[in-house]
Amino acid sequence: MFLILTRNFPPEIGGIQNLMHGLTKSLTKLNIVKVFADYHKNYLDFDKNVNFSIERVGGPKLLRKYRKSYLINEFLKNNRNVECVIADHWKSLELINTNKKRICLIHSKEI
């Protein structure tokens, strides 16, 4: 299983959103994919039409960060079949406790 951690995912519009969605769709051809993404307006219409699991996390930004990392860490603890964690930003990984392989995408002004 691949675990995708992102703050940027459709139906929100943008380049990194398209990249994360395309990457997720491609990875579903290789293995099961689970996505943890931020809540976005109209997400229900989008989420019901994909062939992978998406868990949306909402709330105020600061609280969402801690709540989302808690949910991800619990998921990792209870799902030993995760092979790799892929994140769209270092901030998506900073509170994640795992010894699984981690891939962090770098884009825009982060370098």
Predicted regions and their residues:
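Active-site proximal beta-strand in glycosyltransferases
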Residues: F2, C84-I86, N97-I111
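Short His-centered aromatic/hydrophobic patch
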Residues: I86-S92
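Short, well-structured alpha-helical segments in soluble
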Residues: Y70-N81
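Catalytic nucleophile loop
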Residues: M20, S92-L93
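A structural micro-motif
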Residues: N31, F52, V82-E83, K100-K101
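N-terminal strand-loop element at the rim of the active site
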Residues: T6-I13, L19-R64
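Short glycine-rich, flexible loops that bind phosphorylated cofactors or substrates
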Residues: L62-L63, L93-E94, I111
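Short, Lys/Arg-enriched, disordered terminal segments
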Residues: M1, K29, R80-N81
